[in-house]
């Protein structure tokens, strides 16, 4: 006899929800009314036996300790009269079936229904994501036929009640299962669940009640969006069947990377190169930001890899564009690989000056100075 956990495809530590999900999935797959393959019915019974034990905490504890021997012959197909929460599972499975305790047919689908939602992927520039922009897009979607107004019937005519289902949109058939007799409810094959048939179709839409058209839309992209941001455009999805309301359009954004700027949440990061003299003496330079060229103060004594902050020059907060992040600028100090004779003389004098100030400054040929005093020879 197969292990009950293996039968359900779960590990021995599986919780009640995992067991229930596994059982529902397998019961759907192997139900005799759905799966006509040889052995499906026997497999269905094994699945039922496994869940009947593992779904009961007391029986599961005995099974975990003693195996099937600890069940005392109690493991078997569940009794419909003593199923407890087990019956709820079957009510979920067979929402299209009627049977003991069943409420019967599903909600009918006659009349207008809402149309499907649509997805549109839009790529935008870095600065467009920062500050927002209005963009024009073209989408193909279904619109209600303006000739038949969604009925699908030729003007002057109309749909008639389906003779197969009597307008219910559903048909039933009795089915016997290991759990007793059930009434399976399915869409009517004649009217496809609408409860109505069209004898004389609209020539404009071919009886569909909808037509595919390409439509121009102007999309407002708010400031602060990022890759993965989803914008909802109400009522711009597909038109619903039989004159039903349209679904929605969802625009998914992808933001192009910037050549020099990098986004990190609400902050922007970039780098700037300065000379060793600018780092030592300080300077005022101009840097690129999303707001355009901006003045940046380089403090005297700036160290390599120092990060200077431009407040409120980052990304606006989505939904509250007044609040912005910062622009963080990493400073790269460039050491010249070649010096002119005049530069070398001046720096040598500076090195001598520092050497005279104390022993700690004596080894001027190492570190910064060793990099400055490279030979000018080619």
Swiss-Prot record:
Zinc finger (CR-type) residue numbers: 132-214
Domain J stretches: 3-67
CXXCXGXG motif repeats, residue ranges: 145-152, 162-169, 188-195, 202-209
Quaternary assembly: Homodimer.
Family per similarity comment: Belongs to the DnaJ family.
GO cellular component, one term: cytoplasm
Name the UniProt record assigns to this protein: Chaperone protein DnaJ
Known role: Participates actively in the response to hyperosmotic and heat shock by preventing the aggregation of stress-denatured proteins and by disaggregating proteins, also in an autonomous, DnaK-independent fashion. Unfolded proteins bind initially to DnaJ; upon interaction with the DnaJ-bound protein, DnaK hydrolyzes its bound ATP, resulting in the formation of a stable complex. GrpE releases ADP from DnaK; ATP binding to DnaK triggers the release of the substrate protein, thus completing the reaction cycle.
Cofactor note: Binds 2 Zn(2+) ions per monomer.
Coarse class of the protein's main subcellular location: cytoplasm
Cofactors required: Zn(2+)
Domain-related comment: The J domain is necessary and sufficient to stimulate DnaK ATPase activity. Zinc center 1 plays an important role in the autonomous, DnaK-independent chaperone activity of DnaJ. Zinc center 2 is essential for interaction with DnaK and for DnaJ activity.
Gene from which this protein is expressed: dnaJ
Keyword set includes Cytoplasm: yes
GO biological process terms on file: chaperone cofactor-dependent protein refolding; DNA replication; protein refolding; response to heat
Residues annotated to bind Zn(2+) 1: 145, 148, 202, 205
Cell compartment(s), UniProt: Cytoplasm
Protein residues bound to Zn(2+) 2: 162, 165, 188, 191
Tree of life domain: Bacteria
GO molecular function, one term: heat shock protein binding
Lineage: Bacteria, Bacillati, Cyanobacteriota, Cyanophyceae, Synechococcales
